[in-house]
Curated annotation (Swiss-Prot):
Protein name, UniProt field: Metal-staphylopine-binding protein CntA
Gene3D superfamilies: Dipeptide-binding Protein, Domain 3, Periplasmic binding protein-like II
Membrane-topology annotation of the record: Lipid-anchor
Gene: cntA
Lipidation (N-palmitoyl cysteine): C21
Pfam family, one: SBP_bac_5
PANTHER family (alphabetical): NICKEL-BINDING PERIPLASMIC PROTEIN, PERIPLASMIC BINDING COMPONENT OF ABC TRANSPORTER
Length: 532
């Protein structure tokens, strides 16, 4: 085990860590009340699911889509069945007739049309989802039948409609001026929990929906409690003030690996990990014209500086496997190998020399035309593992004569930089099993995705067109081949450097049963969990 933090070491010395002292009462009270209280580094935010200001794990307790994406494919949810026209452009959904919104309003075809129309009024915001650009119109056929018409066939349509947002449903009574793009009055969905008291930057309550149309939650309440990651979150779990923690929708864990082990060792908690959900990666911004990262040869050199085996083993403690390609082979349509560059400092050095960046006699930093080889890297300051990786890469880059300045920022600020292009390198992650490969690939050319990162590619328009064409292919083998061709070109550009295949980690009371995962790293089925 790596060196303990000072606070944890003090607790261990005082005998509090392993005895479980002080934690049982809080845990027992929560069990008696059938309540989970999870620790989170940020407030749940704006719970309007038609924009992107809220916590996805929180929103998924309240709102539901027409269909759900499972390991066995697309399954019914609010729609009990559907038909697809021969040309692949018309989807007819037959809705459940026993669903009510939290405010008592009937869920029907009219509500579906109003919600999808509301999302489409803000479709530029959703451009990373291809379906948002293809929806032509929505027609109500009868009270519980709705028709969705696309401008062209789009094979991933159902998968994108199954996502936790934005195509989920808010009570039309909550709309402002007949739409949701400027906010909603309340947050009434159809899901197994209702939003209760919300104290901004403190806590939020999600109460059991006793009128839920499906299997009702065994828990009476799920509470989100805001606190800093690290020691504060650890002590809160130890005392039983909170009793649940999980990887959030930005890939951030409130607890580091040492804290996870210590909590498990108390005997009060269990730790569960999902299958690989996404790929953690380093994004190198080809569009940053005032920096060396705009040079393809330099980007390729950086790809050879990342020792993913060492990162996975030593920094991630073996909990995540090294990622040798952008998408793992458990992702839909990725049934091929696409190995990326291997760790090779000699090769990296050769490529930097080739790009004209030379080591001088009086400086450890490479120079070209009198300019130092310097880059800025950004990581999520809420993630202890990203910080460790950034520090490790800083040392590796120094060996190669690169001055790497590392900067920790909030996850929201990182997302802003991704959109604006104001970065040289940053840590990020693929969209995940529920979304991929289509969503991450679509994001290669989306303004609020990775357009800035790919904007420096010489033949970018050709690649962008290939992406659009791939999404129209109905045949699975042909679509897979198209994705392979796109990913081969992208990998050659050295923009997305895979590091590890990330999974979702959950810390839960030892006597909590049915702790499971979905296909999404952005949500958890809290309604299925129950105490022994």
């Amino acid at each position: 085990m790596r060196k303990l933090t000072k606070m944890s070491a003090m607790l261990l010395a005082s005998g509090l860590i392993l005895t479980g002292c002080g934690g049982n009462k809080g845990l027992e009270e929560k069990k008696e009340n059938k309540q989970l209280t999870y620790t989170t580094v940020k407030d749940i935010g704006d719970m309007n699911p038609h924009v992107y200001g809220g916590s996805m794990s929180a929103e998924s307790m309240i709102y539901e889509p027409l269909v759900r994406n499972t390991k066995d494919g697309i399954k019914p949810l609010l729609a009990k069945k559907w038909d697809v026209s021969e040309d692949g452009k018309t989807y007819t959904f037959h809705l459940r007739d026993d669903v009510k919104f939290h405010d008592g309003t009937t869920f029907d075809a009219d509500a579906v049309k109003k919600n999808i129309d509301a999302v489409q009024q803000n479709k530029k915001l959703h451009s990373w989802l291809k379906i948002s650009t293809l929806i032509d119109n929505v027609k109500v056929k009868d009270k519980y039948t709705v028709e969705l018409n696309l401008k062209e066939a789009y094979q991933p349509a159902l998968a994108e409609l199954a996502m936790p947002r934005p195509y989920v449903f808010v009570s039309p009574k909550d709309f402002k001026n007949g739409t949701t793009k400027d906010g909603v009055k309340k947050f009434d969905g159809t899901g197994p929990f209702k939003l209760g008291e919300h104290k901004k930057d403190e806590s939020a309550d999600f109460n059991k929906n006793d009128q839920y149309w499906g299997e009702k939650s065994k828990l009476n309440k799920v509470q989100a409690k805001v606190m800093p990651a690290g020691e504060t979150a650890f002590l809160s779990m130890k005392k039983g003030e909170t009793n649940f923690a999980f990887t959030d929708d930005r890939g951030t864990d409130s607890l580091d690996k040492d804290s996870l082990k210590q909590l498990k060792d108390t005997g009060d908690y269990q730790v569960k990990r999902s299958q690989p959900m996404n790929t953690k990666m380093l994004v190198v911004n080809s569009g940053k014209k005032d920096n060396a990262v705009s040079d393809k040869t330099v980007r390729q050199a950086i790809g050879h500086m990342v020792n993913r085996d060492k990162i996975a083993k030593e920094i991630l403690d073996g909990q995540e496997k090294p990622a040798t390609q952008l998408f793992a082979k458990n992702v839909t349509d990725i049934n091929f190998d696409m190995p990326t560059r291997k760790y090779d400092l000699k090769k990296a050095e050769s490529l930097l020399d080739e790009a004209g960046w030379k080591k001088g006699k009086d400086s450890d930093v490479r120079q070209k035309d009198g300019k130092n080889l310097e880059m800025a890297m950004y990581y999520d300051k809420g993630s202890s593992s990203q910080k460790e990786q950034a520090e490790y890469l800083q040392a590796e880059f120094k060996k190669m004569g690169i001055k790497l300045n590392i900067n920790g920022e909030t996850s929201d600020k990182i997302a802003e930089r991704r959109t604006s292009g104001d970065y040289d390198l940053m840590f990020n992650q693929t969209w995940g099993l529920l979304y991929d490969p289509q969503s991450t690939i679509a994001a290669f050319k989306a303004k609020n995705g990775y357009e800035s990162a790919t904007s420096g590619i010489e033949n970018k328009d050709k690649i962008y067109n290939s992406i659009d064409d791939a999404f129209k292919i109905q045949n699975g083998k042909e679509r897979s081949d198209a994705y392979k061709n796109i990913l081969k070109q992208i990998d050659d550009e050295g923009i997305f450097i895979p590091i590890s295949h990330g999974s979702m980690t959950v810390v839960a009371p030892k006597d909590l049963e049915k702790v499971s995962f979905t296909q999404s790293q952005y949500e958890l089925p809290f309604n299925e969990m129950q105490y022994k």
